[in-house]
Structure formats: structure tokens, C-alpha cells
């Protein structure tokens, strides 16, 4: 095989590799995945006031994101999202909670345009 033929073959393989990596990289990088939360999933907290903090692997659009509190009686309450300095974090505050099983339902919009959702169950207890 001539050196021009080898170069052409190498060039085609390199272009294909660059294309595949760029497509996969964009796809994998953009989805919002919850890295950590407070309260923690399955954890318990002491009432009545509970700070809420959700940290994601990518920045999220806070203006188009939602937080809801699922109450022990199955009622749902919208939670306000407080402005925060970190673009990968959503913050809110729960007040006046009584002992029982709750969950925070979240929905976020990632930079790639995909919506991610999840729930964080937790228990509120007295001291």
C-alpha cells in the first residue's frame, strides 16, 4: 500500500473516530443526573424546618425546573426554587413539617434539552 493510500485510510478512520466521540460526548454530557441531595434519599430529618439542596452533574435551567413536596396524605405542594450561585444546584426550604413520610419530586432541564425527573423519599421525625 502506498503512503498516500495509508494516509487516506488513516484520515478516514480519524474522521470517523472524531465524529463518533463528538456525538457520544454531547449525548452523555448533557443529561442531568442527581449527584447528591439534602435531605438524602431514604434519610430522616428533624422537623419542622428542612433545607433542600439538590446537586446535579451538569448545570440545570432553574427557571424551567420544578420541585414539589409529596405530603404524607398524598397532597402535592409546589416548592419555590431559591436563587443559588452554583448553576448545577437547586435550593429550597421546607417549613412547618410534621412527622411522617415525604418525598421531593424534581424535574430539571439540562443543557442538551432533555428533561430529567426523580423522587427523593425521606422521613421527618421529632427530635
Short names for language-model regions:
Residues 41, 47-48, 98-99:
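Surface-exposed loops/turns
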Residues 93, 98-104:
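A glycine-anchored, Pro-Gly-centered beta-turn/N-cap motif
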Residues 37, 45-47, 51-58, 113-127:
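Extended, polar beta-sheet/loop recognition surfaces of beta-rich domains
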Residues 52-80:
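Short, surface-exposed alpha-helix to beta-strand junction/turn motifs within ectodomains of secreted
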Residues 24-35:
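Proline/serine/threonine-rich low-complexity linkers at boundaries of modular beta-sandwich domains
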Residues 3-15:
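Bacterial N-terminal signal peptides that target proteins for export
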Residues 13-23:
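Bacterial N-terminal signal peptides
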